[in-house]
Amino acid sequence: MVKLISNSTILLSLFLFSIAAIANAQQCGRQKGGALCSGNLCCSQFGWCGSTPEFCSPSQGCQSRCTGTGGSTPTPSGSAQNVRATYHIYNPQNVGWDLNAVSAYCSTWDANKPLSWRKKYGWTAFCGPVGPRGRDSCGKCLRVTNTRTGAQTTVRIVDQCSNGGLDLDVNVFRQIDTDGNGNHQGHLIVNYQFVDCGDN
């Protein structure tokens, strides 16, 4: 009888532990509108937060805060395919690369960065399906590829948008619109990948 109660207690404890773990699980990524995991955890291909290689390895389909080895140090990561990219006339070269002059959302945090930082990459607004939002996206870099032609470039996020993708500076848009189809349609279809800006 004592052994039966002991086994029942163990099974009940395991059951309650499992329910608690499920209740505390956090969803992220495209399954949760691009949400990031708290505590710098990685977002798995299935939209769950964790810190093991199954969650953090790009080869396992990690969506954000991925690492090369599955450790806990976040690196710029996450990607999306077939995203709409429109253009915005920032023309930063005409305003001295001044984020305040174009009323960019990220100017609150990045307007006083060195000129070399502000002009290192073309500018974009970001509201893509995968990646950080708001202040957390400011200053991050994306490798953007035109799906039609394969032309690609790296851009820096300086603003927000509402088109569900990217709003590239017109100069960047033209740079990857190598066949003119984007200009004709008023948008491009692109893939993007978060990459290290190399700012150190």
UniProtKB/Swiss-Prot annotation:
- Mind listing the UniProt keywords for this protein, alphabetically? Chitin-binding, Disulfide bond, Signal
Outline the inducing conditions. Answer: By wounding.
Q: Which organism is it from?
A: Solanum tuberosum
GO biological process terms held by the UniProt record: defense response to bacterium; defense response to fungus
Which InterPro entries does the annotation name? Answer: Barwin_CS (IPR018226), Barwin_dom (IPR001153), Chitin-bd_1 (IPR001002), Chitin-binding_1_CS (IPR018371), Endochitinase-like_sf (IPR036861), PR4 (IPR044301), RlpA-like_sf (IPR036908)
PANTHER family recorded for this chain? WOUND-INDUCED PROTEIN WIN2
Domain Barwin residues, every copy: 78-199
**Disulfide bridge positions per record:** 28-43, 37-49, 42-56, 62-66
Q: Name the chain's protein.
A: Wound-induced protein WIN1
Signal sequence interval, chain numbering:
1-25
Q: Which residues form the Chitin-binding type-1 domain?
A: 26-68
Molecular function in Gene Ontology: chitin binding; RNA nuclease activity
CDD domains with a match to the protein in the record: ChtBD1_GH19_hevein (cd06921), DPBB_barwin-like (cd22777)
